[in-house]
Amino acid sequence: DSIVSGFNIEEQSMYEALGKLPDSYRTVLYLHYYEGYTFGEIAKILHLSPSAVSMRVSRGRKELKEILKEE
């Protein structure tokens, strides 16, 4: 069965991969993709510039792809 504790295998793999990211990347990715915040909103929450948030999302996505490739 592909359902494990309410998550399908793809969701569980993504959740585990997110846990391997540095906090700075994990936080912005979570706020943007799971909570739906814009880069501007995240910037205000974390006291960063919108461009810094954009860079962290970009780098975090790249690192996440590498982690998922390894699995």
Predicted regions, residues:
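The N-cap/first-turn positions of alpha helices
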Residues: 24-25
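A short pre-motif secondary-structure segment
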Residues: 28-32
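Short acidic-aromatic loop segments in the C-terminal HATPase_c
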Residues: 33-34, 58
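DNA-recognition helix of helix-turn-helix
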Residues: 46-70
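Acidic, proline/glycine-rich intrinsically disordered inter-domain spacer in sigma factors
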Residues: 1-19
